Every structure is written in C-alpha cells, then in structure tokens.
C-alpha cells in the first residue's frame, strides 16, 4: 500500500509529525534504524541504574501539552511532569556555589546571598531585556516555520523591524553578558547557555539571551519515569492514531523523480512509496547520503559530547538533579573545541542525577550519574580509539575530583561510555554533532535548514538539525512544522 507519508526516524520530531498528520487522516509509516523509538532520547540500564542517555531537561512544557492537545489528547493521561528546583546547581573551583531557581523571589534571594545585591539587580535587568527580545521574536523565530531573510519582509512580521536593534545580532553572546554583569562567575554562568545548542558564547550572537530567559521563565521539568517516558508517550499516541512503525529499518536512499520525493529505500533493499517524505534525520546526512548529493556543503557543526553513565554508591556529595562544575579556563575551553578541534583537558562538567527526583530510576541504594562534557565533532570515522577514550575518561574523573574529592572511590560499576563516534554511528549524526549546525555566526538563525526542502518537492525536514533547532521543545515544534508543510503541499 502506498503511504501518504513516510517518516525517516522515530525521534521526537518524527513522532510528533506522525501523530499530527495521523490525527488529520493521513496514513503514516515511520521507519526507524534502531529497535525502539526515541532517537537520541534513549534509556540505558547499567549497574542497577536507569539512565537517560540523551536529553536530560525539559523547558517550555506547554509545547509538549500543545502537541498532544492538537491531536485531541491530554498530556496528563500519558505523562506526569515534575518541576525541578533548583533548576541547576553551579560550582566553581574556588568553592563558590549557586542554586538557580525559577521562582523569582527565591532566585533574587539566592543571587543576593551569593553574589551581592548589585548582581541581583543586574540579573533582573538582563532578564527584562531578554524578555522583550523573546516576546518580540518568538512568533517569527520559534513558533512558526521560518524561510530565511525574506521572512522579515512579510507583512505579518513587519512589526518586528523596530525591535531589531534590541536583538543584538552583531554582538557576541559573551560580550553582551559581560556588558550586563560585573561578576565574572555570572558572566560564565550565562555564557554556558550557548551550549544548549552546541555553540560558543565567544562566537554566537547575543540573541541567545532568550535561552536563559526561557529556562528561568518556564522552569526546568522532568517526567516521572525518566526523560524516555516522553518518547514512550509519543509512541503510544502515534499507535492510538494508527501510525505504523517499522523498526530496524535503516533508510539508505530517498527516492526522487524529477526533483520530487517518491519514497525511500532501506539498506535491506525494501522500497516504500509515499506521496510525501519527512526526514527526521540529520539534514546534512539526508542531503549528502540519502539524496546522494556528494557535493553538499557541510555546515559548521555544533559540539558533540563525551558521556559517562556512572552507577555510584551512596556518597557524601549531596548532588542536585542538575549540577555544573565550571572550569577556570572557559574561553580556552571553547577555543580548544571550535578552533583547535580538540577535546579540552580542563573542562566544564555537567552531571545529572535523575534519581534525586525520581527514586524509581535506581535500585540497591545506588545513584545514577549522567556525566557530559562538550567535545568537538569528529572529522573522520573511528576517531575515538580505546586508548583515547580511556585517557579522556581519566581526565574527566580527575576534573570532577577537584570539586568532589575521592569521588572515584564511590563508583559502583565501570562507567558506560558514549563517544562522539557512537553518536555519529548510532544516529547518522554528522561528526557526532548533537545539534546539527552551530549558531556561531550572526546569521545562523536564518541559515538553519527549513522544514520544507527548497530543492526537492514533497520532502520535508524535522529534528534538532532543522528549524527551529535542538532541545526537546524545539524538536517537537519542528515536527509540527514538517506536518504543516505536508498539509500545505497536499
């Protein structure tokens, strides 16, 4: 049977596109390379612990609720979201610690206590500026498809033009942060938000100020049962609406005729015809490998990551759900990643211990430490040898022990390691990049691949490498926009 729509990849973007279309009567089949849905949102059981081995934080929960509501469902019947407070705990090597709260009263109190009244006032002024930018731009850049520079000149977007100077396109994110804050630790804390889409604060535009505003405004959330419960909820709703899933189906080619998508072929030789194809794959992979366009220009890629899933015995460290351990060499860290194309030896470390919020994730009095360090994307296959992996594991553990002395003595089982090579091979992510292209230019927001392919009719894109970008809420929106693109061209 010929499908109305074939979707490549059962990530969150692909599944949202599938359930939106199925709810409107389209016949949809999703082909997934792996044996389960979720894409990078996956779960690993290791050493008496469950780990979310991909995304670890939800912001803008209303996007999740809206996605289900648009199909006639109520999210609360599929998923229970828990607020995380503090959103994140920050530590520096000199012993300074700071809890970031979504509640403005608690945040003001903590900021004044740790950094002083002036810093509290600076933060409030910063967030007020970012709020204006977010509300001026959200309907153009986030909540609708975006088709490049020409979007500015559409009648509906003309009210944005007077606000353009406040967007600070020509300013670097770090420069903007340094103009607002006098305390270098707060500059570093806000600089870190550029890593939410895999970019450098020293290269990315100041428009990224909306990222901390969104987190502070809407809070941090976690679904009971782990982040993977989100993938399970989307999968369940898709099945209820009649979406067909075929797992262990690695798509090898998007079939075209006269520059029109006609279906796909998998590596085992099976052909699937469709009126429309949605690619939830990395956009560069889709163009270079699936469309066989050998001369596709590779974008500047976002960061990849080195992940360790560490089962820990009970310990005295009193970890929060989310913790960031800052290095003292932040600018050098990003120079090493983006200019030298090397993994930094003195690195900032992110640790998520979801068992702190959800005891169901651990057994036998263990703690589940998800440890992530930013790395450059790979430039060739099999770049992470066993020797290189072991050496970097040692470097990261040594760095953690500068904050948490003797931490390694509490490790209960050998860490489960995920390298940039693994991200590349498992998910066809170019160079193991976690977010597709970086935002390391003033025009990066306008150059992100569009949801409607500009060259191949009836081909559409969603996922973290397409508009509007990476992170759970934006990927959900990308699936919605891809579905809208199908409906607009049907």
Model-predicted regions and their roles:
Residues 210-261:
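Helical element adjacent to the flavin cofactor pocket in flavoenzyme catalytic cores
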Residues 314-418:
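C-terminal segments that line or cap access tunnels to active or ligand-binding sites in enzymes
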Residues 2-138:
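N-terminal glycine-rich phosphate/pyrophosphate-binding loop and immediately adjacent elements
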Residues 183-197, 346-350, 406-468:
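A glycine-rich dinucleotide-binding beta-alpha-beta segment and adjacent secondary-structure elements
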Residues 93-204:
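Rossmann-like flavin
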Residues 222, 252-363:
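Mid-domain catalytic core of redox enzymes
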Residues 55, 464-486:
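A conserved FAD-binding loop/helix module that cradles the flavin
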Residues 164-173, 216-236, 384-392:
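Short beta-strand to alpha-helix junction loop
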């Amino acid at each position: 049977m010929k499908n109305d729509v074939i979707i490549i990849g059962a990530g969150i973007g692909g599944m949202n596109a599938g359930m939106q279309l199925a709810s409107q009567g389209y016949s949809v089949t999703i082909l997934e390379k792996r044996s389960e849905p979720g894409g990078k949102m996956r779960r690993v059981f290791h050493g008496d612990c469950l780990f979310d081995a991909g995304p670890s934080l939800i912001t803008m929960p209303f996007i999740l609720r809206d996605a289900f509501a648009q199909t006639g469902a109520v999210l609360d019947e599929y998923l229970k979201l828990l607020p995380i407070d503090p959103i994140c705990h920050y530590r520096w090597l000199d012993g300074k610690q700071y809890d970031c709260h979504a509640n403005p009263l608690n945040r003001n109190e903590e900021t004044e206590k740790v950094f002083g009244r002036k810093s509290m006032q600076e933060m409030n002024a910063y967030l007020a500026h970012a709020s204006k930018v977010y509300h001026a731009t959200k309907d153009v850049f986030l909540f609708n498809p975006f088709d490049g520079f020409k979007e500015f000149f559409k009648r509906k977007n003309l009210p944005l033009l007077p606000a353009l100077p406040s967007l600070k396109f020509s300013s670097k994110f770090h420069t903007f942060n340094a103009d607002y804050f006098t305390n270098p630790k707060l500059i570093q804390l806000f600089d870190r938000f550029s890593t939410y889409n895999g970019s450098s604060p020293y290269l990315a535009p100041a428009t990224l100020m909306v990222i901390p505003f969104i987190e502070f405004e809407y809070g941090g959330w976690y679904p009971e049962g782990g982040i993977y419960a989100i993938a399970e909820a989307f999968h369940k709703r898709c099945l209820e609406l009649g979406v067909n899933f075929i797992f262990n189906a690695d798509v090898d080619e998007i079939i075209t005729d006269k520059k029109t998508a006609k279906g796909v072929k998998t590596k085992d030789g099976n052909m699937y015809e469709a009126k429309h194809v949605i690619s939830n794959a990395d956009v560069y992979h889709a163009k270079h490998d699936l469309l066989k366009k050998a001369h596709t220009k590779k974008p500047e890629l976002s960061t990849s990551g080195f992940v360790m899933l560490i089962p820990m015995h009970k310990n005295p460290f009193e970890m929060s759900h989310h913790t960031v351990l800052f290095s003292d060499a932040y600018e050098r860290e990003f120079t090493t990643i983006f200019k030298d194309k090397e993994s930094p030896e003195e690195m900032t470390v992110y640790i998520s211990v979801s068992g702190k919020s959800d005891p169901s994730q651990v057994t036998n009095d263990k703690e589940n430490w998800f440890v992530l360090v930013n790395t450059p994307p790979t430039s060739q296959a099999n770049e992470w040898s066993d020797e290189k992996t072991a050496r970097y594991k040692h470097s990261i553990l040594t760095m953690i022990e500068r904050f948490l002395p003797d931490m390694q003595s509490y490790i209960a089982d050998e860490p489960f390691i995920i390298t940039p090579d693994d991200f590349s091979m498992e998910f066809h992510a170019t160079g193991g990049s976690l977010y597709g292209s970086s935002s390391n230019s003033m025009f990066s927001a306008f150059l992100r691949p569009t949801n409607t392919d500009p060259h191949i009719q009836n081909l559409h894109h969603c996922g973290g490498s397409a508009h509007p970008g990476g992170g759970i809420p934006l990927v959900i929106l990308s699936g919605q926009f891809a579905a809208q693109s199908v409906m607009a061209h049907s």
